[in-house]
UniProtKB/Swiss-Prot annotation:
Keywords: Cytoplasm, Elongation factor, Hydroxylation, Protein biosynthesis
Pathway: Protein biosynthesis; polypeptide chain elongation
InterPro entries: Elong-fact-P_C, NA-bd_OB-fold, Rib_uL2_dom2, Transl_elong_fac_P/YeiP, Transl_elong_KOW-like, Transl_elong_P/YeiP_cen, Transl_elong_P/YeiP_CS, Transl_elongation_fac_P
Keyword set includes Nuclease: no
Lineage per the UniProt record: Bacteria, Pseudomonadati, Pseudomonadota, Gammaproteobacteria, Methylococcales
This protein's name: Elongation factor P
UniProt GO molecular function: translation elongation factor activity
GO annotation (BP), single: peptide biosynthetic process
Purpose of the protein: Involved in peptide bond synthesis. Alleviates ribosome stalling that occurs when 3 or more consecutive Pro residues or the sequence PPG is present in a protein, possibly by augmenting the peptidyl transferase activity of the ribosome. Modification of Lys-34 is required for alleviation.
Source organism of the structure: Methylococcus capsulatus (strain ATCC 33009 / NCIMB 11132 / Bath)
Subcellular location, principal: cytoplasm
Length: 188
């Protein structure tokens, strides 16, 4: 494993902390007027999802985590596990509820996702930034009904609920931003 010093800390860096792989969310260098400089770091534990804040004195080191991000194709969900495959090697991985988390409402079969693996075990699933999903249920848009801000809830084929404009109807395919959960456009 490689060792990183506090001077090399940056957002997105994956390190080992207390035996668990973590990713750095924020890293702030603090140089007080009196005393030794230090780094204030926010880390997310990749196994539990818990966020912790730690301080490291200048010159301290951490071990990098042997974590890889791999593009995989989503195959299916068997009720307990979500199954993914590496398109080049056809190698399959099964991710549990903790790894999939909120991404499950955006997963559609055959979509390409990014899986974070630690010791060949999926820790996190990142859906594509934009997905195209079919609307299974939404209220009909009544002309002139814009007092509510010009939007209505729509249930998608994966079960996710998104606010859409009044002109969008049931059965249409829409593009959704998975990072914000917002409607982007209709798909022709």
């Amino acid at each position: 494993m490689a060792i990183v010093s506090t001077s090399e800390f940056k957002n997105g860096l994956k390190v080992m902390l207390d035996g668990d792989p973590c990713t750095m969310l924020e890293s702030e260098f603090v140089k007080p007027g009196k005393g030794q400089a230090f780094n204030r770091v926010k880390l997310r534990n990749l196994k539990t999802g818990r966020v912790v804040e730690r301080t490291f004195k200048s010159g301290e080191t951490l071990e990098t985590a042997d974590v890889v991000d791999v593009e995989m194709q989503y195959l299916y969900n068997d009720g307990e596990l979500w199954h993914f495959m590496v398109p080049e090697s056809f190698e399959q991985y099964a991710a549990d509820q903790n790894a999939v988390a909120d991404a499950k409402k955006w997963l559609k079969e055959q979509d390409i996702c990014i899986l974070t693996l630690f010791n060949n075990v999926p820790l996190a699933v990142q859906p594509p930034n934009f997905v195209e999903l079919t609307i299974t249920e939404t209220d009909p848009g009544v002309r002139g009904d814009t007092s509510g801000g010009g939007g209505k809830p729509a249930t998608l084929e994966t079960g996710a609920v998104v606010r859409v404009p009044l002109f969008v109807q049931t059965g249409e395919v829409i593009k959704v931003d998975t990072r914000t959960g917002e409607y982007v456009s209709r798909v022709k």
